[in-house]
Amino acid sequence: MENIIEINYNQTGKSKKTNEYGMREMQARAFEKRNSQYLLVKAPPASGKSRALMFIGLDKLINQGLRKVIVAVPERSIGSSFKNTDLKSYGFFENWKVDPRNNLTVGGDNSKVKSFVRFMESDDQVLICTHSTLRFAFEKIDDKAFDNCLLAIDEFHHVSADVNSRLGELLRSIIHNSSAHIVAMTGSYFRGDSVPILLPEDEELFDKVTYSYYEQLDGYEYLKGFGIGYHFYQGQYTSAINEVLDTNKKTIVHIPNVNSGESTKDKYDEVGKILDMIGEVEYQDDDTGIIYVKRHSDGKTLKIADLVDDQVGRENVVAYLRNIEALDDLDIIIALGMAKEGFDWPFCEHTLTVGYRGSLTEIVQIIGRCTRDSYNKTYAQFTNLIAMPDAKDEVVTYTVNTMLKAISASLLMEQVLTPDFKFKRRRNESEKSSTTGELFVKGLKEPSTENVKKIIENDINDLKAKIMQDSQVQKTFSGEVDPKVLNKVLIPKVIQKVYPNLSDEEIEEVRQHVVLDTVMKGAKSEVVGSKEFIRMADKFINIEDLDINLIDSINPFQKAFEVLSKELNSPVLKLIQETIDAKRINFDEDELVFIWPKV
């Protein structure tokens, strides 16, 4: 299997080093904005968001005069990230302390809401609870009770601007009816796959701190590289998984949801078949729930955690996973809905996911499981096992669409896993470009309004997500559509849909930056003599000759076509093309006028 994406990192150690206050690079960046009333922190898994919140929360209590800090997490297990922490020994002015009575993520569900209400009426300062407890407690207390308090929402992508989202409604109510401060934290670079997290007018209130995935991984000590690959199968995935499951690597296997097309509809049988493929089950430990399997190839005993079986013993398995310390404590995890968000197994080298995942946030979370820095690995891998279209298959259109969506998701991941560029319009020949600094581009329109500037600086990845998930755009992955039609017709259409208030001039400015950024992040840099060249699609270009017209002649999704061509045989490619052709791209009259000279 050849990877569609390969990224190398420089092991600078920067993201792990701490300053005189004991803060890592991301935490120090967030702490600089500690006085903001509303703060949105976007940073990848394992970058230290929990501790960043501790620093900010303590400053708000001690130096800014706030009364309380309330931390809401999506599930109980994540509450342990906010346990008592010694910060003073590393240079900070106070330790993070939580009274056991106020950690509502421990134990059963009895009287959690009562405990929350008691906390709000007491002089206690710090409380940890789940999103669910926060929602139910909110119904019992007035918005004004949150005056002069900090409400921190971890895994903020769970919030939604949808009118039916109770967490979203709660947040809007607190913003508009109290003097509360809010810190929102997320490891996802995409607001949501259809509904935004916040209404635009609410989002404008937030100061933003972004720490990129590239900064995080490039600043690691051990990790040198990361790859994203696809493997296509026909029939049932359980008969093909052995082709991509390397049992020498510490691996998390995510099997498909029982409602998905890839599922056999019997999740327990699927786990059984995977175990049989690996080896012979020797026994299951009564205390821990861990399954001991004697590997077929060499007789080595592997320790495997089954998180799919949701019977009584799963709590024991979860408890075992929480206390893993040694490399040999575990070899493989098989999971369905678990081992994603907030789950920590630094030794994991490979995440193998069966079937397409509709949520980009979920893909970010899954990838985050294998990209932790650890002494046992220099390379991490995400593999997606996807059904190959079959002409005899009744759901061939569904399979083709699923494949295109999966490939678009990995192209999006490449956009956040590679370094960011700074683009400027080339005004004279003496300006020198560099892929590690500024890139000068002939004919590039620079932002003419504050609105465009904000979109380019803060929302470009969200916009790319909308573009790549657009069904019309995905039809261009087969390589049959002229790049200029994609870049100058289809992409502006999506921009206009997402930002209906932009003028034509503003749309063009945003379009140029989106296309340019997408093309450059998929390009490879090569130095020949004293000159730097960029290889993009089938072109090899001197970095000083970058021109917006040249960029517009390149399909930014060329890689999608390349992966399809390499991994699939001719009959399957023909089938994909025919399926796409059956659903032609629709153009209005103005668009046809633009396209006509090319036909």
UniProtKB/Swiss-Prot annotation:
Short motif (DEAH box): ranges: 154-157
Respond yes or no to whether keyword Oxidoreductase is given for this record: no
The record's listing under Gene3D superfamilies reads: P-loop containing nucleotide triphosphate hydrolases
SMART domains this protein is in?
DEXDc
Q: Which residues form the Helicase C-terminal domain?
A: 236-408
EC number(s) per entry: 3.6.4.-
Q: Where does ATP bind?
A: 43-50
Please name the GO terms that the record assigns under molecular function: ATP binding; helicase activity; hydrolase activity; nucleic acid binding
Transmembrane intervals: none
Span of domain Helicase ATP-binding: 30-207
Q: Which UniProt keywords apply?
A: ATP-binding, Helicase, Hydrolase, Nucleotide-binding
Record carries keyword Glycoprotein: no
> What family is this?
Belongs to the helicase family.
Q: What is this protein called?
A: Putative ATP-dependent helicase YeeB
Protein's organism: Bacillus subtilis (strain 168)
Its organism's taxonomic lineage begins at: Bacteria, Bacillati, Bacillota, Bacilli, Bacillales
